[in-house]
């Protein structure tokens, strides 16, 4: 619900800091510009100066945010949604995503996030709700960001060079275009990644899109091997839970061979970078 009206469709994006709204929602509710009429929006591929509006109240599940200043964004990544709920708005809450039932729940407690989980991984808070996990791929250690708003899994140049993909394979990469929340379109190279290890979780047979993506600079990860784990991987598990208060991420069993991990007993273990 927005300003007591709705419901409206929002995408929960754990890789976004700001919550955003679409021009369609602004028009439907007659939202007025905020006291700060424009904001700098940082997306995967670039930055933009965009208009901003103030939501008197945003409500979903156990979450209520008052006087939310939100950038107004239209982009292909919105996928027809009315807005995006960013990680900063989930501070102190738990997120439970059930991919089998196509449902998302936000709650104050961790019960929904933990339910049925086979693996718990402790993360590190970075800023504005963003969390990173320690990972290893092809013998290279780095950082991983769980991003429910990214369609594909992305890697930065530091990881690509550390893996020496060009010299190791002796082949040329497939080239693709990567779109974000801003108008910039970035070039990406598609390489099949070695097995990605996050705690006891093994992510197999994943095509990673590597590029000099703007967001890695925003997160100050441009010099550290890093990946953004997108929905091409996350969508293979039965459910995903994130406890934003305690920085814990929970996974249930995978529905495919893409992701495997040691079950249940590992719930008592955590991993710090």
Model-derived features with residue positions:
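Pepsin/retropepsin-fold aspartyl endopeptidases
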Residues: 1-273
């Amino acid at each position: 619900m927005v300003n007591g009206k709705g419901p409206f469709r929002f995408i929960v994006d754990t890789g976004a800091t700001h919550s955003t709204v679409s021009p369609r929602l602004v028009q439907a509710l007659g939202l007025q510009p905020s006291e700060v009429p424009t904001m700098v929006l940082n997306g995967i591929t670039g930055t933009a100066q965009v208009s901003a509006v103030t939501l008197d109240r945003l409500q979903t599940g156990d979450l209520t945010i008052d006087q939310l200043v939100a950038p107004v964004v239209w982009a292909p990544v919105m996928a027809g949604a009315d807005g995006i709920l960013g990680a900063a708005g989930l501070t102190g809450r738990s997120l439970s995503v059930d991919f089998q039932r196509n449902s998302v729940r936000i709650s104050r407690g961790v019960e929904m996030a933990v339910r049925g989980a086979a693996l718990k991984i402790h993360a590190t808070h970075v800023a504005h709700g963003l969390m990173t996990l320690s990972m290893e791929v092809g013998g290279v250690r780095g950082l991983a960001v769980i991003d429910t708003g990214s369609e594909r899994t992305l890697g930065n140049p530091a990881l690509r060079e550390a893996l020496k993909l060009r010299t190791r394979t002796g082949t040329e990469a497939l080239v693709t275009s990567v779109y974000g929340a801003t108008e910039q379109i970035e070039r990406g190279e598609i390489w099949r990644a070695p097995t990605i290890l996050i705690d006891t979780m093994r992510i197999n047979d994943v095509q990673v899109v590597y590029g000099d993506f703007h967001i890695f600079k925003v997160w100050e990860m441009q010099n550290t091997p890093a990946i953004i784990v997108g929905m091409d991987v996350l969508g293979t598990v039965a459910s995903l839970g994130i406890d934003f208060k305690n920085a814990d991420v929970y996974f249930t069993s995978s529905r495919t061979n893409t992701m495997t991990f040691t079950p249940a007993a590992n719930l008592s273990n955590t991993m710090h970078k």
